[in-house]
Amino acid sequence: MPTRGFIGRRPPAEVADRLPPGQHRTDDFPVLSLGPTPSVNLDTWKFALMNGPRPLASWTWAEFDALPRTSLRKDIHCVTKWSKFDTDWEGVMIDDLFSIAGIAPPTDYLLAQSYDGYETNLPIVDLIGGRAMIATRYAGAPLEAEHGGPARLLVPHLYFWKSAKWVKALRFTARDEAGFWELRGYHMYGDPWREQRYTGDP
């Protein structure tokens, strides 16, 4: 028997082209995390680009906060089936980070690594060409810790578990290495428009 709510109902025509299959729209911003929210001290915060264990470039908070900023308005989609439209973010584009660091990606893949030990894998192509940023502000204010502040990865065209909270490094990998949820049955890519939620989804 269908449950009350979105299941079994078509989305309104005005949002149908923005709402991936199996999703429902929310005006809230649900908080879903692996564990307790880590306390990240800005005085000791550091973000790095790494090739395996070798650092290629790194920034303190003061240095990172002085980098060129970009604003984005994007829809976001969680694997738990909620979508939120027109979210406003500000941060440093991955393209700009690579350019400022003077590097070309040495591999085709990387792992985003977080201060709480979380990791998730991404193809480089999904981070460049204006598709992703390290976000430090949301809705005109500093990014709250519960939503990944002081800085999180934002990859809005993939399910939101790929937008790692409390990010501390992007580590280039020689192959597509599974991260935390990918090792536990989540899809290696996570395209919401193809409903790539779990291993075995097309």
Language-model region placement:
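Structured, non-membrane catalytic/scaffold regions adjacent to prosthetic-group chemistry
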Residues: P2-P202
